[in-house]
């Protein structure tokens, strides 16, 4: 729960965004951070992968749970933080600030998150639960089939 609150606080910078609700907020933040510099197709792929995980037993059953999934540690003062580089989505635990700076991309991410969550966008990923930038080669990527979207594979 603490992770979800930290995530929401970093994204809810406008009065309009404060009324989005946790699912839209978490998905929009994931789209922004994972694919903010990608095409609309890349952003949609990230959103669909996030939602596809919610529908599977092996992942948390909420969008925020999926986005913030990963091991955590607690400091002596009781603060909880994600373990660096051990999250499902690398931006969440890379040690960098998670504050959107591009309002146009942030607004587009919110718009797309709403569309995906309200079933108004076709899932062209065919139920994909993973993706990666084609400049990296994670160990999990070898035994799977791909759909290629410019810099991201799903």
Where are the regions a protein language model picked out?
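Catalytic glycan-binding domains that act on GlcNAc-containing polysaccharides
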Residues: 14-146
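Sec-dependent signal peptide recognition
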Residues: 1-8
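Conserved small/polar residues in nucleotide/adenosyl-binding loops
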Residues: 147-154
């Amino acid at each position: 729960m603490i992770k979800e609150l930290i995530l929401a606080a970093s994204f809810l910078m406008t009065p309009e965004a404060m009324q989005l609700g946790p699912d839209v907020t978490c998905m929009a933040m994931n789209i922004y951070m994972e694919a903010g510099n990608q095409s609309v197709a890349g952003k949609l792929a990230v959103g669909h992968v996030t939602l596809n995980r919610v529908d599977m037993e092996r992942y948390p059953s909420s969008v925020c749970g999926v986005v913030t999934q990963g091991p955590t540690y607690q400091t002596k003062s009781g603060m909880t933080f994600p373990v660096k580089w051990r999250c499902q989505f690398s931006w969440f635990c890379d040690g960098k600030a998670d504050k959107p700076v591009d309002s146009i991309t942030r607004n587009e991410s919110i718009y797309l998150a709403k569309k995906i969550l309200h079933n108004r966008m076709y899932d062209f990923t065919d139920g994909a639960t993973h993706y990666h930038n084609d400049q990296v080669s994670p160990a999990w990527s070898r035994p799977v089939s791909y759909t290629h979207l410019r810099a991201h594979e799903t």
